[in-house]
Each structure stands twice: as C-alpha cells, then as structure tokens.
C-alpha cells in the first residue's frame, strides 16, 4: 500500500517537473530573444472516448471527442499540470483541453481482440484512471481481465489502467471461467 502512495507522489512530482521544465525553457528562450513554440506529441490512452473540453476543468463545455490511440499535439499545460492543451483536432474548434492522465508519451498498441490476462500479485492491485493516475478501484490476485491496449509499462483494461507487470497473459483461446 505504501508503494501505491509512493507511485501517486511520484506521478504528481513528475507532472510538476514537466510544467517547471516548460517554464524554464520559455525563460531561457526569452532571455536569448528567441521563443520557440512548445510542441509535444502524445497519444490518447483511455477506455472508450475522451472528452475534449473548452477549458482545463472537468465541468467545462465538451467541444469534441478523441479515441484510444489518437495522436495529439500538445502545446501547453495547465498550471497544475493536470490538463494539456491540444491542437490540430478533427473537431469544430480544432483545439481544446484533455486530462493529462489519459495520455501517453509512447504510441498505444490497440489490440484487435483484447487478450485475457490474470492478475498476479501478493495482494490487491490498483486500477488507475490513467497512466500513473488516481486509483479508481482495486483488483485481486486471480482476477481475469481483458487487455484493450498497451503503452510502455501500462495495460489498459476495462475501467482503467494498471502496470502490465502485474498481468500474466493466458494462452490464445482461453477464456474466463464463470
């Protein structure tokens, strides 16, 4: 359980460091008289559809939708690092804000028919809202899950994401017992 808390702290520290790095790069560029626009490619990593919003708040107007695996261009982060501004979208506005936790720096491998995997751990394992996101539920050792996509060390399962190292893939043709 302490390891999960440490992971949450590390993910928050990383988000702050990303924002700090962006600010530092802008300051350095400004002092040299040249400010290059910031751009970063990220990939949508979510179970289903991701809302694109008008501003970096959960209650903000929805202006479009993205799907798992979509490539986005990030050009700004919210002050708290929880949201990213994306451009070049196939939506009416062509831009908007999405939650950072539903993005990945690595390409997302979409799986045609999600393979089954069993949770292998000494205790329960956190299923998170996104990569290194907040815990949304626990799952127990022996639970069989369908893996929808993979990105780096993370596996997307129905209802969230979890570290792939806790999963052992079942042989093709296997299915969960009732």
Report the location of each language-model feature.
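N-terminal Sec-pathway targeting helices
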Residues: 2-18
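Generic beta-strand structural signal
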Residues: 45, 77-79, 119-120, 149-150
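SH3/SH3-like (including bacterial SH3b) beta-barrel domains
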Residues: 54-71, 76-77, 129-144, 148-150
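Short aromatic-glycine-enriched beta-strand elements
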Residues: 80-85, 152-156
């Amino acid at each position: 359980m302490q390891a999960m808390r440490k992971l949450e702290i590390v993910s928050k520290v990383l988000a702050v460091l990303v924002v700090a790095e962006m600010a530092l790069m802008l300051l350095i560029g400004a002092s040299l008289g040249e400010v290059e626009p910031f751009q970063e490619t990220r990939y949508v990593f979510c179970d289903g559809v991701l809302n694109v919003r008008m501003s970096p708040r959960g209650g903000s107007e929805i202006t479009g939708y993205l799907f798992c695996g979509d490539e986005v261009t990030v050009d700004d982060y919210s002050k708290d690092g929880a949201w990213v501004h994306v451009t070049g979208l196939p939506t009416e506005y062509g831009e908007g804000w999405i939650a950072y936790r539903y993005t990945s720096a690595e390409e997302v491998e979409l799986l045609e028919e999600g393979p089954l995997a069993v949770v292998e751990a000494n205790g329960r394992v956190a299923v998170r809202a996104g990569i290194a996101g907040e815990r949304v539920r626990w799952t127990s050792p022996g639970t069989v899950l369908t893996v929808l996509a993979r990105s780096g060390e993370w596996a997307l399962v129905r209802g969230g994401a979890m570290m792939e190292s806790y999963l052992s893939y079942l042989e093709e043709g296997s299915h969960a017992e009732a």
